[in-house]
Regions:
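Sec-dependent N-terminal signal peptides
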Residues: 17-27
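C-terminal segment of classical bacterial N-terminal signal peptides
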Residues: 28-37
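Early exported N-terminus immediately downstream of N-terminal targeting peptides
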Residues: 42-117, 121
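Short beta-strand edge/turn micro-motifs at domain boundaries
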Residues: 157-185
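Low-complexity, intrinsically disordered terminal/linker segments enriched in charged
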Residues: 178-217
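N-terminal secretory signal peptides that target proteins for export/translocation
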Residues: 1-17
Length: 217
């Protein structure tokens, strides 16, 4: 089984689920025009802070100059990486097998999974067209929060929600839900299917091949 990007059944929403497989792309969506203020809350404010940083980089005319694409990408990856908890996402996506891994295997898996998630990054930057976003509300329960938004593009409205975990000093994203489809759950289903008939080493091999394709010029 080949590892794929996130997907939903409606073809109309395919591109948005592709965005869900690129973390920077997701943030770029939210850097559009906010048509409704977000409900006040720590998690929402954390997302706003990251979104503002992303928007600043995306709109920087100097970084749009030929030859500076790699620099812009690295800056965006840094900003997104500060908000998204790739290790927590990896742990949840892999499920129970995570607890059996060595620290070395965990580190390798996180790095490969992060590359997979950010694989469609460049395309999302180029495709960004200033979609509007409606901020709906924030729901919190102890150390967990969900910031609910809706992307407005033409006549289509697509629910886009961020699930965050309070890490003590900041809120970090551990899942993204596009039109009711959890990114983490989607990958957990794929990984579980692979591991039912193959070894963890086989899964890593597939991730390495996918990563090499993503990094290829």
């Amino acid at each position: 089984m080949e590892i794929e990007g996130s997907a939903v059944t409606q073809a109309q929403r395919w591109s948005w689920c592709r965005v869900a497989s690129g973390m920077a792309g997701l943030l770029l969506l939210l850097s559009g025009v906010a048509v409704q203020p977000a409900v006040a809350g720590g998690a929402t404010e954390a997302m706003k802070s990251t979104i503002d940083e992303v928007l600043k980089i995306v709109q920087d005319k100097e970084l749009k100059q030929p030859g500076r694409a790699d620099e812009r990408r690295k800056r965006l990856e840094q900003v997104v990486g500060d908000r998204f908890d790739y290790q927590e996402m990896s742990r949840r996506a892999l499920g129970a097998p995570w607890n059996t891994l060595s620290d070395k295997d965990k580190q390798e898996f996180v790095g490969l999974f992060q590359t997979l998630l950010t694989g469609s990054y460049a395309d999302k930057v180029e495709a960004y067209s200033g979609e509007g976003v409606q901020y709906l509300n924030e729901r919190t329960e102890k150390d967990f929060a969900e910031v609910r938004t809706k992307v407005l593009t033409g006549k289509t409205e697509i629910p886009l929600d961020y699930r965050l975990l309070n890490k003590g000093t900041d809120w970090r994203v551990y899942d993204v839900v596009v039109d009711g489809v959890s990114l983490v759950s989607n990958y957990r289903g794929q990984f579980s299917k692979i591991l039912r008939s193959s070894t963890f080493a086989d899964l890593l091999d597939q991730l390495h091949k996918k990563s090499d394709k993503i990094k290829a010029p």
